[in-house]
């Protein structure tokens, strides 16, 4: 099972077990993973899990989406 680790400046803020196929990420409360930070768009990105692979799609967020960065 995939796992998403949310960190800031090397400090782990949250960990999520990714058991579903799709997760929305953003600042608004209707997202599966909510990040309450002004640099995160309301509907920021989408995580898609297919078999043993995970894909991250930016949803035209203002500040972009980065992996390991």
Predicted regions and their residues:
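Forkhead-associated
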Residues: 3-5, 12-69
């Amino acid at each position: 099972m995939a796992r998403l680790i949310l960190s800031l400046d090397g400090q782990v803020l949250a960990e999520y077990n990714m058991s579903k196929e799709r997760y929305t990420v953003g600042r608004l409360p209707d997202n599966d993973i909510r990040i309450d930070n002004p640099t995160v768009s309301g509907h920021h990105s989408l995580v898609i899990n297919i078999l043993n692979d995970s894909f991250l799609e930016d949803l035209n967020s203002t500040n972009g989406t980065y992996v390991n960065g």
